[in-house]
Each structure stands twice: as structure tokens, then as C-alpha cells.
Swiss-Prot record:
Keyword Metal-binding annotated: no
Protein name: Putative defensin-like protein 307
The entry's keywords: Antimicrobial, Disulfide bond, Fungicide, Plant defense, Secreted, Signal
InterPro entries, sorted: Nodulin_late_dom (IPR009810)
GO biological process, one term: killing of cells of another organism
MF annotations from Gene Ontology: metal ion binding
Family designation: Belongs to the DEFL family.
Annotated S-S bridges: 29-49, 35-54, 40-56
Amino acid sequence: MEKSALIFIGILLFSTCTSIMARTGYVSCKTNSDCVKLKCPTPFGGPKCISGSCECPFKELMTLPNDTNYGVAACIDYCKAKGEIVYACILNHCYSYKPPM
């Protein structure tokens, strides 16, 4: 019984290892294609290569269209128009999340 429990726990830990490593940034990368083998437990898509490490997105990232004003006010308005709560506007990228129900 103890052996089977240890084997089960070992398999469980091994199967979640890649997603844990992706969330904590232990997997190094140069492009987004280096992170394809990792699976993210988030609804915001697959892992992305950010600053040389694979990370799972936990907030939705929206890029403003090219024809918009690049000010913070335009960024906030664009994200609010999508029905999201604005978290931050940095370098023409809008970080937002869905409001709680």
C-alpha cells in the first residue's frame, strides 16, 4: 500500500513538473517556439518566452491597434471596451483581467 502511494505521488509530481517550472521561470528560451512543449494551466494561452525564460500568462495581454493614440488613457479605454478590468498599461500593451462574477 505504501509503495503504491509513493509511486502515485511520484507520477503526479513528475506530470506537473513542467507546468510548475514554466510558472516559476526555470525553463530557459530564446523564442516562443522553445516553450511549445510546456503546458500552461491558464485560459490565456500557451507559455511565452519572457526575458529568457518560459512563463505561463496569468493575465490577458492585449496589444493596441496601430492606429490608436499611444497614451495611457487610450490604453485604458481600449481595455474597458473589451469588458476587462485594467491592471496596467505598459509600452502600448494593456494588462487586464476579467471581472469576478
